UniProtKB/Swiss-Prot annotation:
Keyword rRNA-binding: yes
InterPro entries given in the database record: Ribosomal_uS14, Ribosomal_uS14_bac/plastid, Ribosomal_uS14_CS, Ribosomal_uS14_sf
Subunit composition and interactions: Part of the 30S ribosomal subunit. Contacts proteins S3 and S10.
Protein name (record): Small ribosomal subunit protein uS14
Keyword Ion transport: no
GO molecular function list: rRNA binding; structural constituent of ribosome
Lineage: Bacteria, Pseudomonadati, Bacteroidota, Flavobacteriia, Flavobacteriales
Family to which this protein belongs: Belongs to the universal ribosomal protein uS14 family.
């Protein structure tokens, strides 16, 4: 499990990106690159990293469900994800 501080840091980045999205878009369209440099570093969407919503694990992220592969497997085996079942052929 990821440290709580890492999860909180990622949430803070998401809020910062959302806060400056419109301003960032306007600066890009105007070609004001110096204005872009004055924005906070965390206002850039490139700095965001997908993390598991339950454990905060940064790797093995499944976008469709928003959780890591490990958490997905546990939940699917326990029948906690509707419509997902183990494949057999």
């Amino acid at each position: 499990m990821a440290k709580e501080s890492m999860k909180a840091r990622e949430v803070k980045r998401e809020k910062t990106v959302a806060k400056y999205a419109e301003k960032r878009k306007a600066l890009l369209e105007a070609g004001d690159y110096e204005g872009l440099q004055r924005l906070p570093k965390n206002a850039s969407p490139v700095r965001l990293h997908n993390r598991c919503k339950l454990t905060g694990r940064p790797r093995g992220y499944i976008r469709q469900f928003g959780i890591s592969r490990v958490t997905f497997r546990e939940m699917a085996n326990n029948g906690l994800i509707p419509g997902v079942k183990k494949a057999s052929w």
